[in-house]
């Protein structure tokens, strides 16, 4: 039996609320509701949001399309955090609007690194000629 203090990953409720918050943030960003020159110049993707166990903190992982100007975009989102929080509160029915944090999404970089690794000569040599031909 698992002890209550052990971390087993996010609960179903955390995942459901995280997805609602993700949709709300993405909608605000896509509609251009924020009056910020940095944000208006970029299309920003929000691939993931993670909620704290008490649902009072949401960490949004964001990436500008094309991967350019990541740091200025994150800084602009942090500057507009209060407005975004109000918009999330309007769109998501929760007792408390979660505080928002923004982080750079590194999953694209990690996937590219793994892809480069799998395509490297050393790995291809280890896989042998049968793997390359799909046999």
Swiss-Prot record:
UniProt GO MF annotations: ribosomal small subunit binding
Q: Name one Pfam family in it.
A: RBFA
Q: Where in the cell is it found?
A: Cytoplasm
- GO terms for biological process, alphabetical: maturation of SSU-rRNA
Task: Give an example GO cellular component term for this record.
Answer: cytosol
- Oligomeric and partner information: Monomer. Binds 30S ribosomal subunits, but not 50S ribosomal subunits or 70S ribosomes.
What family classification does the UniProt entry report for this protein?
Belongs to the RbfA family.
Name of the protein described by the UniProt record: Ribosome-binding factor A
Provenance organism: Methylobacterium nodulans (strain LMG 21967 / CNCM I-2342 / ORS 2060)
What gene is this protein translated from? rbfA
């Amino acid at each position: 039996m698992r002890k209550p203090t052990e971390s087993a990953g996010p609960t179903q409720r955390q995942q459901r609320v995280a997805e609602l918050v993700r949709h709300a943030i993405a909608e605000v960003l896509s509609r251009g509701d924020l009056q910020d020159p940095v944000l208006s110049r970029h299309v920003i993707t929000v691939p993931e949001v993670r909620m704290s166990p008490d649902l009072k903190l949401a960490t949004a992982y964001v990436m500008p399309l094309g991967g350019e100007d990541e740091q200025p975009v994150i800084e602009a989102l942090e500057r507009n955090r209060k407005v975004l929080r109000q918009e999330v509160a309007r769109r998501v029915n929760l007792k408390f609007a979660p505080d928002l944090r923004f982080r750079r999404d590194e999953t694209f970089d990690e996937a590219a690194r793994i892809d480069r690794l799998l395509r490297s000569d050393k790995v291809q040599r280890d896989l042998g000629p049968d793997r390359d031909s799909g046999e």
